[in-house]
Design a protein with these regions (language model features):
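Regulatory hinge/linker segments at domain boundaries
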Residues: 6-26
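The N-cap/first-turn positions of alpha helices
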Residues: 26-27, 41
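Pre-recognition alpha-helix immediately N-terminal to the DNA-recognition helix
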Residues: 28-32, 73
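Short helix-to-turn junction characteristic of helix-turn-helix DNA-binding domains
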Residues: 34-38, 78
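Recognition helix of helix-turn-helix DNA-binding domains
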Residues: 38-73
Length: 84
């Protein structure tokens, strides 16, 4: 039961973050993979069936919306973010 509650909490946080920062569907896909994987940009791009350049554009958009400057900064920001 605890695992289901944890999953619900994490999904609720993700959805609140998405809403708060007005993320597009593709930005959500990118963020989910960045959160769940420490793979290289090339591998993540392949998993999303997009080019590395496209992935970098989505990451830049996420950084702009969250006022972060890097992949690591984005992840740190997400994990420390508190729902308003």
């Amino acid at each position: 039961m605890l695992e289901k509650e944890r999953e619900k909490f994490l999904e609720d946080k993700f959805q609140a973050f998405v809403k708060n920062y007005a993320l597009t569907n593709r930005e959500q896909d990118v963020l989910r993979l960045l959160l769940s994987s420490d793979e290289s940009v090339q591998v993540i791009a392949e998993q999303l069936y997009i080019s590395r350049a496209a992935l970098y554009r989505y990451m830049a958009s996420l950084n702009e919306k969250t006022e972060t400057k890097s992949r690591i900064g984005l992840l740190q920001f997400y994990y420390s973010w508190k729902q308003p």
